[in-house]
Regions:
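C-terminal cap/loop subdomain of S1 sulfatases and analogous C-terminal strand-loop tails that border
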Residues: 111-122, 149, 162-164, 169-194
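Active-site rim elements
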Residues: 64-78, 126-129, 147-158, 171-175
Length: 194
């Protein structure tokens, strides 16, 4: 499965890493995402059967779209991501790096399963990434490790545009107002009014 292959390649880094310098790694998983060339979700083998009895979220159930058909594969993709993040965490622990590593899990958008905004000006493509619907606004952003400890949930709206400034701050670089966004540690610790 694609997420397994991408994680395999990321884990190969540790086969040659000597631990002498800090490292920065980006793993860009594609899942959970519909297959652009096919227009539907494809979870790992067995997803349709394994997740067929999961109840659709109410907002999807009441709208027209393809969620009833696609949701099991979507959940399979989410489970695959979870499994592969677990593989990364286990390798970091095995290498003795976990306690000194910050993991940022972020997404660019969610899915609405073709329930809204199929616009003619986009030649039939969905416009949900650029809307104010939950699928575009309420997406995962989890930061764990380093100074991010304790499991705080931030209710305020934040943006991924703050990630570069946050990552630089983790490396000890204060860019002040030279970049957009905020250091998200300040947001989590309620040190900012923004």
């Amino acid at each position: 499965y694609r997420a397994d292959c991408i994680t395999d390649m990321a884990l190969e880094f540790f086969d040659q890493y000597d631990g002498k310098k800090p490292f920065f790694m980006t793993i860009s998983q594609i899942e959970p995402h519909h297959q652009n060339d096919r227009g539907h979700y494809e979870g790992p083998e067995g997803s349709k059967e394994k997740y067929k009895n999961f109840v659709l979220p109410h907002d999807l159930e009441m709208l027209q779209g393809n969620a009833a058909e696609e949701y099991p594969d979507y959940l399979g993709q989410c489970a695959s991501l979870d499994k592969n993040l677990g593989r990364l965490v286990e390798r970091l622990k095995k290498e003795g790096l976990y306690d000194n590593t910050v993991i940022i899990f972020a997404s660019d958008h969610g899915s609405h399963f073709k329930t809204r905004n199929t616009d003619s000006h986009l030649n039939g493509y969905d416009d949900y990434k650029r809307t104010c619907h939950d699928g575009a606004l309420h997406v995962p952003l989890v930061i764990a490790g380093g100074p991010y400890k304790g499991g705080a949930a931030v209710k305020e709206l934040v943006s991924t545009e703050s990630l570069p400034k946050t990552i630089l701050a983790l490396a000890g670089v204060d860019v002040g107002d030279a970049m957009i966004g905020e250091n998200l540690l300040d947001v989590a610790e309620k040190k900012t009014d923004n």
